[in-house]
A protein has these predicted regions:
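Flexible, acidic/Gly-rich N-terminal and inter-domain linker regions that tether
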Residues: 1-63, 67-71
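Conserved, mostly hydrophobic/aromatic
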Residues: 20, 44, 74, 113, ...
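N-terminal pre-triad scaffold of radical SAM enzymes
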Residues: 39-83, 88-114
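Conserved radical SAM core fold
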Residues: 83, 112, 117-120, 147-154, ...
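Glycine-rich anion/phosphate-binding loops
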Residues: 85-98, 123-125, 158-160, 200-201, ...
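Generic structural signal for well-ordered alpha-helices
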Residues: 100, 126-131, 162-165, 203-206, ...
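Conserved glycine-rich "GG(E/T)P / GGGxP" loop and the immediately following alpha-helix
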Residues: 111-136, 153-157, 226-230
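Conserved C-terminal portion of the radical SAM core fold
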Residues: 137, 170-181, 200-243
Length: 243
């Protein structure tokens, strides 16, 4: 090995990476705690090159936020507001299509659609939004609705989650974003977003989407109340879902 780690605790992890062995939660904690940033970068690049060669990919997307009105009040959220807030808004479908028309002038390849859980907008609003965008921009991929939104839309539609996902997919949904995962640890979620669905439900929504051929992203909100161990646990749970 030509690279020399400043932190000798990374040497056992390097051996695992070299022999394609799976890292443990404890390894994840070590990687979070080490000050050897170049060492972590070296390890990550070994895996990146093995999986993707020397290729890097980007997409050109545009965010569409139909509304910022939300029934929840998550402690960390600066987006969602109540209906009587002076900055509250809800866009008509015509406004959304008009916005998309402006965006698409720049060779956009994806519309990323997320918003608040509006107390009054019907399921048909979201369905017609997907259909309208797909008719107008058939070449643009639509990634829309976090797991929290999808669970809420299923309630609006009065359908099981699988049927809701299929209905949305038929209307033009291509994949789902990873928002709302925050940190899966119950201790933390109870304090920062107790009204949201629990981590296990977030994972089950994504599992259902994968079962229907929909791909998804995943996020992690960190740097607040969580421990390093809870960060590592979050990543392990995502990896288990990916399995």
């Amino acid at each position: 090995m030509l690279f020399e780690f400043e932190d000798e605790n990374l040497n056992p992890i390097y051996e695992k990476v070299r022999f394609h062995e799976r890292l443990s939660l404890e390894d994840g904690v070590t990687l979070w705690k080490t000050q050897d940033l170049l060492g972590v970068g070296y390890l990550a690049n070994q895996v990146r090159e093995r999986m993707n060669g020397d290729k890097t990919y980007f997409i050109h997307n545009r965010h569409i936020n139909p509304t910022n009105i939300c029934i929840h009040s998550c402690q960390f959220c600066a987006f969602g507001v109540k209906e009587d807030h002076p900055h509250a808004y809800e866009k008509s479908l015509d406004e959304i299509f008009s916005d998309a028309e402006k965006y698409n002038g720049g060779d956009v390849s994806e519309f990323h659609i997320v918003g608040g859980l509006h107390p009054d907008l019907p399921f048909e609003y979201y369905l017609d939004m997907l259909k309208g965008l797909k008719v107008r921009f058939p070449e643009v991929h639509i990634q829309a609705f976090t797991a929290i939104e999808l669970e809420y839309l299923a309630k609006l539609a009065k359908l099981p989650l699988d049927e809701t996902l299929l209905t949305l997919k038929d209307a033009g949904l291509g994949s789902i974003p990873g928002g709302g995962a925050e940190i899966f640890a119950k201790r933390v979620r109870k304090k920062i977003c107790g009204e949201k669905l629990i981590g296990e439900h977030w994972l089950s929504v994504h599992e259902a989407a994968h079962g229907l051929g929909l791909k998804s992203n995943a996020t992690m909100l960190y740097g607040h109340l969580e421990t390093v161990e809870e960060r590592a646990d979050h990543l392990v749970r995502l990896r288990e879902l990916q399995d």
